[in-house]
Amino acid sequence: MATISIIRVENPAEKAEISAHILHALPDWFGLPDSTQKYIDDSRSMPFFAAVQENQAVGFAALKETSPCAGEIYVMGVLPEYHRSGIGQRLFAAIRAEAIARGYRL
């Protein structure tokens, strides 16, 4: 298996493209079109990390600020063929590090 990197994504259009690709591949978890579109739209303005293999996103996570001192994982997904490979843990670690950098209390 090729190396998978966790990267920060800043471009809102790229965030939308990545989240749409992955969420649409997960209909058992994100099968309601209106709700899925809301996740895609809202994550465009949030801190966003992607798991990338050979220039292709295979997972992502977005952080939502809930107060000046707290946040939560707003949405997170990993393509089914990459489940159970540790990508979710790595995305969680990136979100956690971002929360700490923003001064959120854990």
Where are these regions (language model features)?
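A generic local structural motif
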Residues: D34-K38, A94
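Conserved acetyl-CoA-binding loop-helix of GNAT-fold acetyltransferases
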Residues: R84-A97
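Short loop/turn motifs at secondary-structure junctions and domain boundaries
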Residues: Y39-S45
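Conserved GNAT acetyl-CoA-binding A-motif
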Residues: A99-L106
